């Protein structure tokens, strides 16, 4: 599927149905089905956290680490989320995980540009007793 500049991505009806079903089941977000590849990283810790101002918008980026694995870099912008609490909630989770050195699970969509952070789709703090299942 190709996106023309300024136009929304035209979704295949089967992808739309599949993405809604998988999203309702809590397996994948709609971006997983129609967009770039996504990856779930479990039991990582937040090593770095940065908040950036970009014009009228905010963006936070984090670097997550797990011993024996490569670093994961992901960012989330509040662009498009000005009227809801999604960005604030995810930022709160990231700050808490960083401050408490908690393990996290994060879902990241690959960046189309090599060497740049992926898009953070979801962030969860693992239970205090240890590991994400």
Curated annotation (Swiss-Prot):
Single GO term (MF): toxin activity
Any Gene Ontology CC annotation: host cell plasma membrane
Protein name: Pertussis toxin subunit 5
Pfam families per UniProt: Pertus-S5-tox (PF09276)
Function as written in the Swiss-Prot or TrEMBL entry: PTX oligomer B binds to receptors on the eukaryotic cell surface and facilitates the translocation of the toxic subunit across the cell membrane.
Species per Swiss-Prot/TrEMBL record: Bordetella pertussis (strain Tohama I / ATCC BAA-589 / NCTC 13251)
Entries under InterPro entries matching the protein: Enterotoxin, Pertussis_toxin_subS5
Subunit comment: Pertussis toxin contains five different chains, S1-S5. They are organized into 2 functional subunits: A, composed of S1 (which is toxic) and B, containing S2, S3, S5, and two copies of S4 (B binds to the membrane receptors). Dimers of S2-S4 and S3-S4 are held together by S5.
Stretches assigned to coiled coil: none
Signal peptide bounds: 1-34
């Amino acid at each position: 599927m190709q996106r023309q500049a300024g136009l929304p991505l035209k979704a295949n009806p089967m992808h739309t149905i599949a993405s809604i079903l998988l999203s309702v089941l809590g397996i994948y977000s709609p971006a997983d089905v129609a967009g770039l590849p996504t990856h779930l990283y479990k039991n990582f810790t937040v090593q770095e956290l940065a908040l950036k101002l970009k014009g009228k918008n905010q963006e936070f980026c984090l670097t997550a680490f797990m011993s024996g694995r490569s670093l994961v870099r992901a960012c989330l912008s509040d662009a498009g989320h000005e009227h809801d609490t999604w960005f604030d909630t995810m930022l709160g989770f990231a700050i808490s995980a960083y401050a408490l050195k908690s393990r996290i699970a994060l879902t990241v969509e690959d960046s189309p540009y090599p060497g740049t952070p992926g898009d953070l789709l979801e962030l969860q703090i693992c239970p205090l007793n240890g590991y994400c299942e």
